[in-house]
Amino acid sequence: MASKASSLGSVSTGNFTPAPPKKGALSGTKEFLESNSIVAKIAFLLLVLIAFIIILRLGIQIISYFMAPSSSPTVLSGMTDANHMHIIPQNPALPHSIPILRSINQQDGIEFTWGVWTFIKNLKPENRYKHVFHKGNNKVDNDLGMNFPNNAPGLYIAPHTNNFVIVMNTFDKIKEEIIVEDIPLNKWICVIIRVENHNLDVYINGVIVKRHVLASVPKQNYGDVYVSMNGGYNGYTSTLKYWNTALDVSQIQRFVNAGPDLAMKEKDMTQSEPRYFSLRWFFQNPEMDYGGL
């Protein structure tokens, strides 16, 4: 029986070798990475480098968004006695610094805007300027009352008058002055100083009252911001703000509508004073110069 052959033929009893599995995407990638081809290695390194650059740029943008100084910081918050001096450092390494970003030159040239609220109680007859604020160095002439040489810009009250004097440095002239006359007392007044290319515009409570064409390009500086130097003036200063662009009319009006920040530690009756003055001032002031507007 054991020697009988099957009618279907003999069956081999040798070793059976299974067919190798088909290579999929993973095995193909492995072969690609393990190959000795220089082209394959260079291509892989390029892919890694591109991915690293993309991730790095995204990371820098995210960090800059959260860590970079604001382009429109509030330099002085709340209401302060205008007889008390404040210094706002520009060195980011110093505590309580509020860096002012220089203007980003647009198609029309350099541009930036400063805004501040002032409340002038009364003016004593003095032979020197009264300091509201300026950005620059710390060298006020005690007799004159004006800082020199850096004012970019500077806002002062002229001697023996209730006139505002705006001072701006340019590359051709160390000091250019713009005068706004007959500022009312005992009223909150919003002063906007707007620079666009060679034009310096002054707005009082949202209305343009002066346009001055500067002799040359405005000269910004890296100096600190000073408020109420040399005794300041008798009154209050509130909400000093900077923008590194030239505000449009709607943005200026939005700042005016927000009003002064009256938050102050000591209580004061100025919160009950009228915020604005009569429109009659705009129409009865014959010295207004709109620069051809």
Please annotate each region the language model reported.
Residues 1-293:
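Extracellular glycan-associated modules
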